Amino acid sequence: MTYDAVIFDVDGTLLDTSEGLISAVNYTIDVCGLTPLTESQLRTFIGPPIQNSLAKYYDLSPEKIQEIAEIFRDAYKEKFLLQAVPYEGIYTVLDKLVQNHIKVGIATYKREDYALQILEHFHFDKYATVMHGADNFNQMKKKDIIQLCVKEIGLTDPSRIIMVGDSDNDAIGAADAGMKFIGVTYGFGFASKEDVMQFENVGISKNTKDFFNILRQLDIIF
C-alpha cells in the first residue's frame, strides 16, 4: 500500500496541552460558580468539544452550556492557550515525513482560530499543507474536519491517507472518512494498546520512537 499523506490530531498527539486546558476549565468552573471537579474528571475535558464535556458533568440547558463554553474559550485563548509542550521527538517525525514527500495535515476539535494560533506558535504550520479546527457552535464532527483537510490536500483516494490520534473520535472520524488509522497511547484518550485495538488500525504507538518504526514498516519513510 502506498500512502500520500498523514493527518494529525493536536491535543494528546502533537502537543501535551493538559496544563493550559485544565487551568482554563478550573477558571471557568470558579467564575461560573459550578461544582468543582476531580483531577481525573478534569482530564476528560482534553480533546472533546467543551460543550460535550460540560454536559457530561452539569445538568444545564444547551443555551447555558453554550454560554459557559464561550466563557471557557475566551479564558483559554487569553490566559492559557500557549501553556502546552510538544511531545518529545514529534518534530523529528514531521521532518522525516516532509523529507519523504508525504503531505502533512492537522485536524483538531480545537476551535479553528485557537488551533491556528497555537500551531503557529509552536511552528507546526511550517510542516502542514493544511490545518483545520472546529466551528464555534460544535456542529462539525471529527469526520467533517478531517474531510476538509483531505479536500484541501487535493487527494482523491482517502485510503492512501493515515489519521493519527489519541482518541476514539479520531479513530471513528478516520473510519468514517475512509482513511487508515494509527492510534497513540501517550496522549489523553487511549490508555492502552487494548483501547486502540477496539478500532481498525494500521499501528499503535506508545511514543514517537514507536511511531517512527510504524512509519518505516508501512514504507512511508525510509
Question: What is the predicted role of each segment?
Answer:
Residues 1, 99-102, 153-159, 218-222:
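Glycine-rich phosphate-binding loop signature in dinucleotide/nucleotide-binding domains
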Residues 3-91:
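N-terminal helical cap/lid subdomain that shapes the substrate entry/recognition surface
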Residues 5, 142-171:
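Conserved Lys-Pro-Asp/Glu-containing loop-to-beta segment of HAD-superfamily phosphomonoesterases
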Residues 25, 90-119, 132:
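Substrate-recognition element of Asp-dependent hydrolases with the DxDx(T/V) motif
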Residues 35, 125-129, 156, 205:
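Conserved H-loop
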Residues 125-140:
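A short, structured active-site edge motif that brings together acidic residues
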Residues 163-203:
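Acidic, Mg2+-coordinating phosphoryl-transfer loop and its flanking beta/alpha structural elements
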Residues 202-210:
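Short acidic-hydrophobic, aromatic-tinged amphipathic segments that line or gate anion-handling sites
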